[in-house]
Amino acid sequence: MMVAWWSLFLYGLQVAAPALAATPADWRSQSIYFLLTDRFARTDGSTTATCNTADQKYCGGTWQGIIDKLDYIQGMGFTAIWITPVTAQLPQTTAYGDAYHGYWQQDIYSLNENYGTADDLKALSSALHERGMYLMVDVVANHMGYDGAGSSVDYSVFKPFSSQDYFHPFCFIQNYEDQTQVEDCWLGDNTVSLPDLDTTKDVVKNEWYDWVGSLVSNYSIDGLRIDTVKHVQKDFWPGYNKAAGVYCIGEVLDVDPAYTCPYQNVMDGVLNYPIYYPLLNAFKSTSGSMDDLYNMINTVKSDCPDSTLLGTFVENHDNPRFASYTNDIALAKNVAAFIILNDGIPIIYAGQEQHYAGGNDPANREATWLSGYPTDSELYKLIASANAIRNYAISKDTGFVTYKNWPIYKDDTTIAMRKGTDGSQIVTILSNKGASGDSYTLSLSGAGYTAGQQLTEVIGCTTVTVGSDGNVPVPMAGGLPRVLYPTEKLAGSKICSSS
């Protein structure tokens, strides 16, 4: 059986991973596969079990199911997974369906039995650690979940926050420009309300700090993704991050870096929403503009406390799938390459590698098992190749993850960027011409390579030679991304059979 070069490389690199740690510095070099536990894999291994996203019901995904599919995840070069919240949820089937997603918790000291047992969750952590991989768990400190109107909540159902005294007085957020409302009023509506915990109270604050430390310890968790961060006052978060004792990355759902970046002063990292829309808009059509993306790369790099600790993404369970905008596979390849080779920690959402095309929630929460988990799909292979060169560059260049990505070229349809110290840099050229894009040679300056140096394009496994003027003649065709790395540095790596 023929085995792809990237599979051999990734296996060799990851089984040799060093002892696990969970500091922000360690997380810089990770690559995250994000999944909804209920929608990724079932214990019975079924690839045909029905999962109608419109029903918004539990579909049967489990922690054991994830364990059984770690080869599939690791085969793409991912070094970590992020799973949705593990706490016990409201038990009812509401008018909006079940709490299969995990964001309507009612008992923070019990686990969601739909996903499995405490032993199953511990087994998942152990299985990841045996592979040199990390476990990131989603957590919610802002709110609980209630099946009913905000004005008639039975607070006794919440554990341990079993009285109204623990919560902000009921009011729904009316004005998102008013930060006081954003923090003190409630999310949800009168069908499913999300009672808002008053995290300014010491009793609430201390409960959360004790809880998060215990959660991390009990299940050997390596990192946390924190939901609805902007809905909690900033001075709550440093203590929470410290109590967790691991890298914390927060969801601050706002596109303005002037609003989002300061949250990095109160926790380790945030999801890179400022770059999300420029990235999406650059590649969701063949008429997208590279200008906003080029400018936002530089803005985030200069304005955020540390862009190398942000999470880069273009898909998640809250936003429409990239393929819901366009079915052009070349555009999807470019956006995936950007995610993996930009500054920060790459995040690919389960199903993205199979070109899933669900629109707004709940359509974007498809069951991954219905794809059959093919490892020969075009995006699976592209993601594996991009992760492979990133992982390899990190292993060879201690400064790679802290070297800030530098856009070196743009035109109406192209952006090029370099990352890594001189002599070991990756240069990525991205196009939005799409699959019908013409063939041409781009003369690229500013890449930092030397005249006559041979480079390997690691997606297509071809080579190019740097011109006498230092420019790189990059052959472009079919709107595909190009990723360059010095050929001599690949010796022994198995990447492109070491060229």
Swiss-Prot record:
Co-factor: note? Binds 2 calcium ions per subunit. Calcium is inhibitory at high concentrations.
Catalysed reactions listed for this entry? Endohydrolysis of (1->4)-alpha-D-glucosidic linkages in polysaccharides containing three or more (1->4)-alpha-linked D-glucose units
Kindly list the positions annotated as binding Ca(2+) 2.
227, 251
Give residue numbers for the site Transition state stabilizer. Answer: 318
Record: residues binding substrate: 56, 104, 143, 225, 230-231, 318, 365
| Alphabetical keyword list | Calcium, Carbohydrate metabolism, Disulfide bond, Glycoprotein, Glycosidase, Hydrolase, Metal-binding, Secreted, Signal
UniProt-listed Gene3D superfamilies: Glycosidases (3.20.20.80), Golgi alpha-mannosidase II (2.60.40.1180)
The EC code for this enzyme is 3.2.1.1
Q: What is this protein called?
A: Alpha-amylase
User: Organism classification, top ranks?
Assistant: Eukaryota, Fungi, Dikarya, Ascomycota, Pezizomycotina
